């Protein structure tokens, strides 16, 4: 079984974990209804994408 030869220092441990951080989700306001939506995705509230209605949403 593989066993570490030396104890990993806190500095080295934290440098390894530096890439594990979560990134904030990107949202932008829908120009049609003002609801928040993901970029390059159609709006869930009104069904518009790129200024056109793609999906009709019944309210």
Curated annotation (Swiss-Prot):
GO cellular component terms attached to this protein's record: large ribosomal subunit
GO-annotated biological processes: translation
SUPFAM superfamilies: Zn-binding ribosomal proteins (SSF57829)
Keywords of this entry: Ribonucleoprotein, Ribosomal protein
Any Pfam family the entry gives: Ribosomal_L32p
GO molecular function per UniProt: structural constituent of ribosome
InterPro entries: Ribosomal_bL32, Ribosomal_bL32_bact, Ribosomal_zn-bd
Family membership noted in the UniProt record: Belongs to the bacterial ribosomal protein bL32 family.
NCBIfam families in the cross-refs: rpmF_bact
HAMAP family registered for this protein in UniProt: Ribosomal_bL32
PANTHER family the record matches: 50S RIBOSOMAL PROTEIN L32 (PTHR35534), LARGE RIBOSOMAL SUBUNIT PROTEIN BL32 (PTHR35534:SF1)
Protein name as it appears in the record: Large ribosomal subunit protein bL32
Native organism: Rhizorhabdus wittichii (strain DSM 6014 / CCUG 31198 / JCM 15750 / NBRC 105917 / EY 4224 / RW1) (Sphingomonas wittichii)
Lineage, opening ranks: Bacteria, Pseudomonadati, Pseudomonadota, Alphaproteobacteria, Sphingomonadales
């Amino acid at each position: 079984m593989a066993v570490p030869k030396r104890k990993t220092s806190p500095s080295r441990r934290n440098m390894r974990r530096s890439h594990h951080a979560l990134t904030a989700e990107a949202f932008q306001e829908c120009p049609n209804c003002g609801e928040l939506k993901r970029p390059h995705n159609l709006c869930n509230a009104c069904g518009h994408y790129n200024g056109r209605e793609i999906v009709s949403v019944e309210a």
